[in-house]
């Protein structure tokens, strides 16, 4: 754990998407590590918002849209970062059907605006561009996707993230060779306390419990690579450190996901969590299905080989930590205290 503190203490970090769920956890951890975090994001769009509840001190902040190229360029100039962690995105599959153009412009054009700002930036930069486990052409064979699997995507969100991967590859090969160090990170379905996004399983269950209503499942038989938010964030930090040190032989992309034997269906998780939160039993409404893939798994062995990264949470432990956070917060606990406690426990295991 001392190594993380030694590397990140005093580092200037531009974190996009710091007002989102994963971004709020990352900002909190980076602050604890002593980094100077500059945030760039839209205002938090959920109420409650983990970002608002945590009140994490920032070295600077710009609330703006990635689709505003001038704002992105200004943020990079003002932050003068050594390292960029790019989380900001339209990250919900259902929302991508409602606004496909907005999803594509946010995810692809927004990332290109960041890449262009980097292209004209005078100093060398290290960047981890976060995409998703859904960038792969998924034939639902059940096999876990390695990083070499073909990219694809049927729904607008998945396709936009696959296109983002191609854009990053193009800018790296065309403009950044020998100057900036970039890589993409692909993580599975992230869970943890403090997520209140719409159309996500655990936030939907928490809301249903508060209303004493049944949560509606689109595909209860679907499996996903569930993982606690601290596992992929730890992976991103390790990846950024290795890139910054110019460690030889690093892959251009890495998967961060649970062990391959940790496959649990949506229905099984919903059954356990509705009981844990005292909510009515879930119900299945097939007409709500929007064509999402039923099987999805990541092969994260390359991250273990190249970074020494491995998930610290088994899936059940990730679910237990998530339930604990929400229960304590709903009982009046302080979100910052709860979050710091879980980060500290995670650090103790490193």
Which residues fall in each region the model found?
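N-terminal Rossmann-like NAD(P)+-binding domain of SDR-like oxidoreductases, especially those catalyzing
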Residues: 1-187, 345-346
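Residue-level marker for well-ordered alpha-helical positions
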Residues: 24, 70, 203, 267-268, ...
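C-terminal substrate-binding subdomain of Rossmann-fold SDR/epimerase-dehydratase oxidoreductases
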Residues: 32-33, 64, 209-350
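Residue-level detector of flexible, active-site-proximal loop/helix-junction positions
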Residues: 44, 68, 134, 189, ...
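Short, charged helix-to-loop "capping" segments that act as catalytic/coupling loops
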Residues: 45, 79, 119-126, 175-179, ...
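Residues in well-ordered alpha-helical elements
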Residues: 69-70, 82, 94, 101, ...
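NAD(P)-dependent short-chain dehydrogenase/reductase
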Residues: 139-144, 148, 156, 162-244, ...
């Amino acid at each position: 754990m001392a190594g993380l503190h030694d590397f990140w203490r005093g580092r200037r970090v531009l974190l996009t998407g710091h007002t989102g769920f994963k971004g709020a956890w990352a900002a909190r951890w980076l602050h604890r590590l002593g980094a100077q975090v500059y945030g760039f994001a839209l205002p938090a769009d959920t109420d409650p918002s983990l970002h608002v509840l945590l009140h994490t001190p920032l070295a600077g902040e710009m609330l703006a849209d990635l689709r505003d190229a001038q704002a992105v360029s200004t943020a990079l100039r003002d932050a003068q970062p050594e390292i960029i962690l790019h989380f900001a995105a339209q990250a919900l599959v259902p929302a991508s059907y409602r606004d496909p153009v907005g999803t594509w412009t946010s995810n692809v054009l927004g990332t290109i605006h960041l890449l262009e700002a980097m292209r004209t930036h005078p100093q060398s930069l290290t960047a981890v561009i976060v995409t998703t486990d859904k960038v792969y052409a998924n034939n639902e064979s059940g096999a876990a996707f390695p990083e070499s699997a073909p990219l694809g995507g049927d729904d607008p969100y998945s396709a936009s993230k696959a296109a983002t991967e191609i854009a990053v590859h193009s800018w790296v090969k065309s403009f950044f060779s020998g100057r900036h160090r970039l890589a993409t990170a692909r993580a599975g379905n992230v869970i943890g306390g403090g997520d209140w996004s719409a159309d996500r399983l655990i936030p939907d269950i928490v809301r249903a419990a508060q209303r004493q209503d049944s949560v509606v499942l689109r595909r209860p038989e679907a499996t996903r690579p569930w993982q606690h938010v601290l596992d992929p964030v730890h992976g991103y930090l390790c990846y950024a450190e290795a890139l910054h040190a110019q460690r030889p032989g690093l892959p251009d992309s890495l998967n961060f996901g649970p062990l391959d034997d940790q496959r649990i269906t949506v229905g099984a998780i919903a059954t356990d969590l509705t009981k844990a939160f005292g909510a009515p039993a879930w119900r299945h409404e097939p007409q709500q299905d929007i064509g999402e893939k039923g099987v999805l798994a990541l092969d994260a062995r390359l991250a273990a080989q190249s970074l020494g990264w491995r998930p610290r949470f088994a899936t059940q432990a990730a679910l237990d930590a998530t339930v604990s956070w929400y229960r304590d917060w709903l009982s009046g606990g302080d979100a910052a205290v709860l979050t710091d406690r879980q980060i500290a426990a995670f650090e103790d295991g490193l």
